[in-house]
Amino acid sequence: MVQIYLPRLSMRLGYHDKNNKMTILLTGGRGKTASHIASLLQAAKVPFIVASRSSDPSSSSPYYQNCFDWLDEKTYGDVLTSKDSMQPISTIWLVPPPIFDLAPLMIKFVDFASRKGVKRFVLLSASTIKKGGPAMGQVHEYLASLGGIEYAVLRPTWFMENFSYPQELQRLAIKNENKIYSAAGDGKLPFVSVADIARVAFRTLTDEKSHNTDYVLLGPELITYDQVAETLSTVLGRTITHIKLTEEELVKRLENSGMPAEDAKMLAGMDTSISDGAEDRLNNVVKHVTGADPRTFLDFATHQKATWG
């Protein structure tokens, strides 16, 4: 197990464009992270727009919305147009599109947004993908190489919410079969909550001084899938069993759920890497950036109890 600890940041006062002369664009508006970030921005009275392929500007949502499709360059200009009396968009939360070769598209949009006056980008990546690596790693490297812009890259480990969001396979297996499935064996990992990712994102999006670095975001404890099953059993009052699959069996399970073959192989490979110790590490980054400890899996499961029926 690797433990990395950073000195706590002093809390920054104010936002990077003072007097709210900023509007933040949240891509991936229907995803796990954007909704949590939106709540934090709304509470802080920071103007923002939520964007996704299915966003409807005329909807009754409490948030301003705009349509954005990574694959449709015609939406790029519209999504960067601020609403009503809002200031121009100065900051973007970048959530990668669900495609294999995502870097060229994301880099093209970053360039387009930069020409339109966007000054800061915060990228959602993954704990196992380093700068210069595949997919988001290429975007990470590009952001770090640009002069004249501010950036941060968030690299969270596996989400706790993968067990609780409505259409997640793990949630359905818990609810309907009293089982969870993995190819991680007895490997340990520090599951992190989307709520904690959002708190770090809020700081990197709004702090007056840009972070200009990447953060590996981990939960507070190393646990196995067997321990996840034990915790769920305790919280739910019924036995939840961890079914240990081979990598090939997990690929087949994911493909049977409708996942494209390339994505299924990639995710199953990441799962197997857990058994080899790829996620066996802890740090204090969440507290370092936000000033508060990340939530435990027990706390998460207790609050999400109703979702598993």
Curated annotation (Swiss-Prot):
Give the induction note: Strongly expressed in planta but weakly expressed in axenic culture.
Stated EC number for the protein is 1.5.1.46
Q: Name one GO biological process term.
A: indole alkaloid biosynthetic process
Does this entry carry the keyword Oxidoreductase?
A: yes
Q: Which reaction(s) are listed as its catalytic activity?
A: agroclavine + NADP(+) = didehydroagroclavine + NADPH + H(+)
GO MF terms on file?
oxidoreductase activity
Q: In which pathway does it act?
A: Alkaloid biosynthesis; ergot alkaloid biosynthesis
Broad EC category: oxidoreductase
Instruction: Describe its assembly.
Output: Monomer.
Q: Which PANTHER family does this one have? A: PRESTALK A DIFFERENTIATION PROTEIN A, PTHR43162
Task: List the Pfam families.
Answer: NmrA
Q: Give the family, as the similarity comment puts it.
A: Belongs to the fgaFS/easG family.
**Key words of the record:** Alkaloid metabolism, NADP, Oxidoreductase
Q: What function does this protein fulfil?
A: Agroclavine dehydrogenase; part of the gene cluster that mediates the biosynthesis of fungal ergot alkaloid ergovaline, the predominant ergopeptine product in E.festucae var. lolii. DmaW catalyzes the first step of ergot alkaloid biosynthesis by condensing dimethylallyl diphosphate (DMAP) and tryptophan to form 4-dimethylallyl-L-tryptophan. The second step is catalyzed by the methyltransferase easF that methylates 4-dimethylallyl-L-tryptophan in the presence of S-adenosyl-L-methionine, resulting in the formation of 4-dimethylallyl-L-abrine.
Protein name (database record): Agroclavine dehydrogenase
